[in-house]
């Protein structure tokens, strides 16, 4: 056992004395030591219940003969951080989380890990750490929030952000806004649509690093507690059978995850995170593979924000295993990939069926023959840009209009709320990339305001920043290279004609080669927005969004 390095033999008497200071008996010390990494806190609704998940995992480990020891890690609530300086500190925590777990595992020689995240960056950060330390590991999340109810309709956090736009536009009064506020987020759990947190929790099932049910069992269901106990038991079986994260997450399982991503219509952030996870798994991932997979993978689900269907409905319809089984009917997935159950994906999904074809479309009658995410390229994004095609109105799949250029999210939001954006405009928000932000903020406040003001059928938005999974509309992010690195987005001027063709994966600015060359000669990037602290260090080390915004 790895933990023998801190407990075996006369030379480790001092270390054993410290373990006994924890209250551990000789019997407990002699067993495998299982690190339980919990991101429980009292600021994220999706993490407030993780103490209960942690206790259930502990029981599962104990039932199977291990000694569980709980260690913490940080987490940011993207919704609370949205629309202000705080959003600069969201994506950057992914690397902090991965690094801190690596430190704890290596320093204390844990034999195996159970990782307990729930929301946006915490999930990929923990998966990245699992691959890096490569000891047996299981991910068990806290589960999705139930949808809110208002006047007989299901609502979510997207409803709230868009309601702010409606209020600013004068189409909603303050009483209605406050009524929505009271019921949009009714329970603990990750926000109720196919936003980033739920996207990643669902994709953990497909990667094989989480048990079936991880992505969709609601946070408030007792079944979630039972699943957590099973996770604690499963990691002990993995330790016994020497199954490690790099045995599970490899090129084949990553391709499975990308295909499921297409079928589910996941958040565009999933592209960023899967790319970063692939890097930790030593898998070379080119963004162009996404369009290739999208052309072969139908879109089977339209979940919020693309519709009013939520994760609880996906759970009732059969969950991720049902979607995988549907995809398997056309041999889209590699079902021979091993998982944390010790079985293959094919064995895991055997006998599972779709219970509601209104939620999960049959493979022969999809919403679209193409997947939910597209990579765009062109002179405006030679290294790629990402759009959630499944959440774009059909009339906006092809759009051409004049650029309205802003050097920060705040500038753009002011223009939107001041009602100076016209139908047909293409809002450009730059210097919000991994380096330029720094931290690659999400533009949910801007996109939600556009939708709330009724402009989502005529206005597009492009940025070198990111979008929340709660964003809908012609919102194109991750434009690479970013402005701070001299990318074309930094050369744009008000009035430049932007051409968007999502059907043909194109993103262009209509300028002559001579004009582009002239602008490049005169280009001077803005001064760094942050010159001290963690963000300053991050900006110096972070890679392009096209590489997953990993640190190098």
UniProtKB/Swiss-Prot annotation:
GO biological process, any: isoleucine biosynthetic process
| Record-annotated active site | 468
Which keywords, in A-to-Z order, does the entry hold? 2Fe-2S, Amino-acid biosynthesis, Branched-chain amino acid biosynthesis, Iron, Iron-sulfur, Lyase, Magnesium, Metal-binding
Q: In the record, which residues are listed under signal peptide?
A: none
Q: Which amino acids does the record list as binding [2Fe-2S] cluster? A: 119, 191
Q: Which residues cross the membrane?
A: none
Per the record, the pathway is:
Amino-acid biosynthesis; L-isoleucine biosynthesis; L-isoleucine from 2-oxobutanoate: step 3/4; Amino-acid biosynthesis; L-valine biosynthesis; L-valine from pyruvate: step 3/4
Q: Which domain of life is it from?
A: Bacteria
**What's its job?**
Functions in the biosynthesis of branched-chain amino acids. Catalyzes the dehydration of (2R,3R)-2,3-dihydroxy-3-methylpentanoate (2,3-dihydroxy-3-methylvalerate) into 2-oxo-3-methylpentanoate (2-oxo-3-methylvalerate) and of (2R)-2,3-dihydroxy-3-methylbutanoate (2,3-dihydroxyisovalerate) into 2-oxo-3-methylbutanoate (2-oxoisovalerate), the penultimate precursor to L-isoleucine and L-valine, respectively.
NCBIfam families in the record: ilvD (TIGR00110), PRK00911.1 (NF002068)
User: What is this protein's name?
Assistant: Dihydroxy-acid dehydratase
**Lineage from the top down?**
Bacteria, Bacillati, Bacillota, Clostridia, Eubacteriales
């Amino acid at each position: 056992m790895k933990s023998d390095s801190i407990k075996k033999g006369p030379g480790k008497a001092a270390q054993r004395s410290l373990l006994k200071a924890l209250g551990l008996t000789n019997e407990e010390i002699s067993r495998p030591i299982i690190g339980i990494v919990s991101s429980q806190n009292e600021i994220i609704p999706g993490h407030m219940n993780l103490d209960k998940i942690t206790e259930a995992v502990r029981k599962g480990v104990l039932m199977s003969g291990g000694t569980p020891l709980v260690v913490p890690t940080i987490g940011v609530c993207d919704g609370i951080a949205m629309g202000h300086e705080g959003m600069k500190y969201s994506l950057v925590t992914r690397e902090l989380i991965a690094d801190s777990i690596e430190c704890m595992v290596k320093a204390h020689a844990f034999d195996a890990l159970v990782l307990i995240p729930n929301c946006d960056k915490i999930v990929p950060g923990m998966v990245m750490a699992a691959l890096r330390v490569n000891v047996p590991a299981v991910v068990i999340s806290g589960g999705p929030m139930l949808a809110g109810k208002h006047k007989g309709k299901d609502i979510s956090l997207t409803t709230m952000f868009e309601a702010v736009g409606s209020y600013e536009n004068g189409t909603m009064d303050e009483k209605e806004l406050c009524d929505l506020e009271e019921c949009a987020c009714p329970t603990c759990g990750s926000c109720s649509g196919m936003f980033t947190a739920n996207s990643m929790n669902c994709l953990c099932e497909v990667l094989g690093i989480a048990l079936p049910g991880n992505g969709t069992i609601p946070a408030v269901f007792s079944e979630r507690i039972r699943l957590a106990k099973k996770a604690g038991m499963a990691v002990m079986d993995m330790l016994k059978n020497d199954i490690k994260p790099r045995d599970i997450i490899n090129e084949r399982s990553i391709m499975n995850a990308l295909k499921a991503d297409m079928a589910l219509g996941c958040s565009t952030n999933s592209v960023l995170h899967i790319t970063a996870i692939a890097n930790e798994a030593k898998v070379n991932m080119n963004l162009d593979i996404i369009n290739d997979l999208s052309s072969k993978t139908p879109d089977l689900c339209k979940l919020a924000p693309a519709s009013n269907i939520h994760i609880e409905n996906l759970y009732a319809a059969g969950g991720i295993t049902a979607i995988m089984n549907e995809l398997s009917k056309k041999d889209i997935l590699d079902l021979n990939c091993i998982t944390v159950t010790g079985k293959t994906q094919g064995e895991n999904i055997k006998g599972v069926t779709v219970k509601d074809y209104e939620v999960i479309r049959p493979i022969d009658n999809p919403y679209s023959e193409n997947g939910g995410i597209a990579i765009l390229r062109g002179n405006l994004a030679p290294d790629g840009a990402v759009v959630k095609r499944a959440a774009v109105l059909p009339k906006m799949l092809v759009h051409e209009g004049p650029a309205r250029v802003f050097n920060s999210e705040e500038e753009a939001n002011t223009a939107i709320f001041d009602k100076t954006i016209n139908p047909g405009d293409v809002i450009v928000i730059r210097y919000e990339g991994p380096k330029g932000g720094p931290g690659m903020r999400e533009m949910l406040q801007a996109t939600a305001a556009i939708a709330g003001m009724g402009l989502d059928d005529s206005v597009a938005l492009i940025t070198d920043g990111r979008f929340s999974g709660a964003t809908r509309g012609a919102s194109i992010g991750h434009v690479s290279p970013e402005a701070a690195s001299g990318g074309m987005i930094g050369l744009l001027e008000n009035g430049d004609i932007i051409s968007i063709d999502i059907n043909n994966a194109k993103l262009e600015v209509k300028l002559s080669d001579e004009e582009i060359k002239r602008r490049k000669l005169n280009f001077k990037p803005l001064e760094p927005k942050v010159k001290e602290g963690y963000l300053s260090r991050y900006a110096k080390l972070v890679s392009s969004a096209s590489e997953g915004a990993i640190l190098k």
